[in-house]
Structures are given as C-alpha cells and as structure tokens.
Amino acid sequence: MPTIQQLIRTERKTLKTKTKSPALRGCPERRGVCTRVYTSTPKKPNSALRKVARVRLTSGFEVTAYIGGIGHNLQEHSVVLLRGGRVKDLPGVRYHIVRGTLDTAGVKDRRQSRSKYGAKSPKE
C-alpha cells in the first residue's frame, strides 16, 4: 500500500475497462461487406451447423458474425449491418448480423419476437 506522500507525488491510475466488441469502435452498429458465408460447429456439449459470415467492416476490421433465425439470403458481397453480442458456443464470434436491414432479409413466417428478426407483421 502506498504512503500518503507517494499518493501526493503520483495519483492512482484509473483502470480502463476493455470493450467486448472492439471492431464497433464505440458505435451501436457498423456496416460491412460479407467476404465469406459458411457454417460452423459449436463447442463440446452442443451439436449443430451454425450459420456465420466473415465481414469486412467500414472501420477496417474483419470479423466473424452470427446470422440468427431460420434461413437467410446472404452471400459473398452482401452489405450487412452488425451489432455486438457474442454467441456462447462459437469461439471467436462476438457480433450478430441485424436481420431486416440493408441486404439481409427478415425471417419468413415469423410470428413471435418479430422485431429481433426483422419480420413484418403477418397480414390477417
């Protein structure tokens, strides 16, 4: 523990918090272009083919992003919007693609939690 004299000489340094989504550069969302769209397998207890995309962002970063929902229309050179949020069972995936914006279509025939998947209100 420092003495009072040491604290007078040099004040305490405040610890900087590390961001969980550095590629966004403090923005809520970022635009990017898909460089590769593929499937990936999750970590140990789970088993599936998760849909992911490699995206080159306007901030210069190239990141891996998860495509949520059932079915998608993304391919190479698709322009997408990215938000933060990791996928727990996919190592290295720290971003989500926002459905229903830019080139990404919303999920078809979605009735519940529509706003999360960019689905329009079903016509009666």
Swiss-Prot record:
Does tRNA-binding show up as a keyword for this record?
yes
Q: In the record, which residues are listed under signal peptide?
A: none
GO MF assignments:
rRNA binding; structural constituent of ribosome; tRNA binding
InterPro entries assigned to the protein according to its UniProt record, in alphabetical order:
NA-bd_OB-fold (IPR012340), Ribosomal_uS12 (IPR006032), Ribosomal_uS12_bac (IPR005679)
Any Pfam family from its record, for instance, is: Ribosom_S12_S23
A Gene Ontology biological process in which this protein takes part is: translation
Q: Which Gene3D superfamilies match?
A: Nucleic acid-binding proteins
Sites bearing 3-methylthioaspartic acid, chain numbering: D89
| GO CC annotation, single | small ribosomal subunit
| Similarity section | Belongs to the universal ribosomal protein uS12 family.
Q: Which NCBIfam families match?
A: rpsL_bact
Function in brief:
With S4 and S5 plays an important role in translational accuracy. Interacts with and stabilizes bases of the 16S rRNA that are involved in tRNA selection in the A site and with the mRNA backbone. Located at the interface of the 30S and 50S subunits, it traverses the body of the 30S subunit contacting proteins on the other side and probably holding the rRNA structure together. The combined cluster of proteins S8, S12 and S17 appears to hold together the shoulder and platform of the 30S subunit.
Q: How does it assemble?
A: Part of the 30S ribosomal subunit. Contacts proteins S8 and S17. May interact with IF1 in the 30S initiation complex.
> What is the name of this protein?
Small ribosomal subunit protein uS12
Species annotation: Prochlorococcus marinus (strain NATL1A)
